[in-house]
Amino acid sequence: MGVDHESAGTVDRTPERRLPTGVARGGVIADARLETLCRYWLERCGGRAMPRRADIDPVAIPAAIWPHVMILEVVREGAKIRFRYRRAGGVFWRAGGAEPTGRFIEEVLPATAGYLDYVVAIYTEMTEAGRPMYSENFFTRDGQGVPMRTRRVSLPLSNDGAVVDTILAGHVFEYPRERDTAFPVVDGLREAVRVYIDETAPN
């Protein structure tokens, strides 16, 4: 997989860095678990633009990755798109402090520093484009002052092959060690990377 360097969003659209290579080459997604999930999604495409929800077999996803996996239902209410958790791995609900299954995203994520709007914008963009996406952001809340980094893949699923009705997502949360210079000092939210994953690029 290669990378389309098109980016969008409402929160600090200037990326911290651009990653030059693709998933199949091992260069874009900076976490092996998320890369494995992307490879699985591509295999399940079977030559189509995106897999169906029924094509995703939990047994086929390695056990080490499953705690990082979420499945979200895309709910269309007229022109509005909402996202409801249908499955959330333990890593996610432990980070959020509650099990979110069955709840809408706005009932779970904090609105602090525009974080809820940021995540909704990522899922909305990916849903409308019908293309897999990788993103990274730094976030602090409640005056903590020490940022958490989130690495995220958002992968579209569609029962009719055209309209995205489900999202297969993977999240990895990283917490800095004391004086870890890899984590910038930020106040609130900062996006580092947002790129489409080009699944048609050669290996």
Please annotate each region the language model reported.
Residues 113-116:
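Helix-loop-helix
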Residues 1-108, 120-203:
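Intrinsically disordered, low-complexity terminal regulatory regions
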